[in-house]
Amino acid sequence: MNKLYIEGDKKLNGNVIISGSKNAALPILFMTILTEKKIKISNVPKLRDINIAIQLLKSLGAQIKYKKKNLYIDTSSIKIHSPPYDLTKQIRASIWMLAPLLIRFGKAKIFLPGGCKIGARPIDLHIKGLIALGAKIILEKNYISASIKKPLTGKRIYIEKISVGATITVMSAATLAQGTTIIENAAQEPEIIDTAKFLNTLGANIIGAGSNRIFIKGVLTLIGGKHKIIPDRIETGTFLIAAAISKGYIICHDTEPKYLKNVLMKLSESGAEIKTGKDWIQLDMRGKKPKSINISTSPYPGFPTDMQPQFALLNSISQSKGTITENIFENRFIYTSELIKMGAKIKIKNNSIVCKGVPNLYSQNVFSNDLRGSATLVLAGCIARGTTTVDNIHHFERGYEAFSEKLNKLGANIKYI
């Protein structure tokens, strides 16, 4: 079943429980390689990418049980320092295995990872960080080989371009290095805070995660522990958009409003009434047509690139014209050609798109090419006139737990075919 059949023209209303963050769970899963003690991780979303990460750990020899969103992990039996290509090629997050395997075995070999086809997403920043700490790196056509003859040594490392991936790689490598490492120009995403919190639970000494300067004082060893994954802020934003574009009402539960300040500000600017509590967000757009908004993506705490496609959809059915500028990834407007097929008026100008609102979108057979674009097309199908078919849906299954089921509970009519 690789297609969705969506009956459109629906208002989406109700309550939704937000799942754990995929982008926090993935690095945390791979950080378990750093300890030989038992780990329990809760609030783990049931996703394709998570399943591949579990398979990767098992391929190395880890013992893992997945029960009711809880993962019980024992990596004490890991003996292999090179995960299989058929798994690493499927998710880009597999690059986060490099540093933990290197530290544990003194060597590691990782085939070049895969994932969404959004721009170049180079891994050179990961490599530069490891070299600065003392690793020897050989980069071949299809794989990265790393080795050390003595423990890594803490250094002051400036990451040239803000990178979540490189920040996590250097932070994990420095956890068991000798001395103190200072990461300058570090990414500040909530998922980095959560990864650091997990490592600190195991005995690491990390200060400053969530700021642009992180201090890591190396420790000799890590212990076991328990950790709960933070809520998925992008899933939260996606469901808020679902209600906003359908003139609906929604309450997102088990989420973190503080991680969505820019998204909530833009939704409010579009005309939505927003209320928040400790772990919930309420949006009310009943009886209103969204106003167009202008957005420019930037690293956290700026506007998230992963919410750009969803807001392009909102602008496409808004009252006037809005511009969205993408500053993180090139080639992230692939989805717009499919929205245009559905009647959207979108023009691409360099790294920006201009969306002129139309009264309605209309059903089409559309094809998804990446995770967030795929989710956007599903939402477009929910509000379009007629019946829409979305093909190649494995993309949204990588990052949204029970997405169609949750939408159906809000009033959508989505079926797998």
From Swiss-Prot:
List ligand-binding residues for phosphoenolpyruvate.
22-23
| Binding residues annotated for UDP-N-acetyl-alpha-D-glucosamine, in chain numbering | 92, 121-125, 306, 328
**EC number(s) on record?**
2.5.1.7
Family matches, as InterPro entries: Enolpyruvate_Tfrase_dom, Enolpyruvate_Tfrase_sf, MurA_subfamily, RNA3'P_cycl/enolpyr_Trfase_a/b, UDP_GlcNAc_COvinyl_MurA
Q: Catalytic residues per the record?
A: 116
Keyword Cytoplasm tagged: yes
tRNA processing listed as a keyword = no
- Catalysed reaction, written as an equation: phosphoenolpyruvate + UDP-N-acetyl-alpha-D-glucosamine = UDP-N-acetyl-3-O-(1-carboxyvinyl)-alpha-D-glucosamine + phosphate
Q: Which Pfam families match?
A: EPSP_synthase
SUPFAM superfamilies recorded for this chain? EPT/RTPC-like (SSF55205)
Pathway terms, separated by semicolons: Cell wall biogenesis; peptidoglycan biosynthesis
Q: Which GO terms describe its molecular function?
A: UDP-N-acetylglucosamine 1-carboxyvinyltransferase activity
User: Mind naming one GO cellular-component term on file for this protein?
Assistant: cytoplasm
Q: Which UniProt keywords apply?
A: Cell cycle, Cell division, Cell shape, Cell wall biogenesis/degradation, Cytoplasm, Peptidoglycan synthesis, Pyruvate, Transferase
User: Which CDD domains has this protein been placed in?
Assistant: UdpNAET
Explain the purpose of this protein: Cell wall formation. Adds enolpyruvyl to UDP-N-acetylglucosamine.
Q: What is this protein called?
A: UDP-N-acetylglucosamine 1-carboxyvinyltransferase
Species source reads: Buchnera aphidicola subsp. Schizaphis graminum (strain Sg)
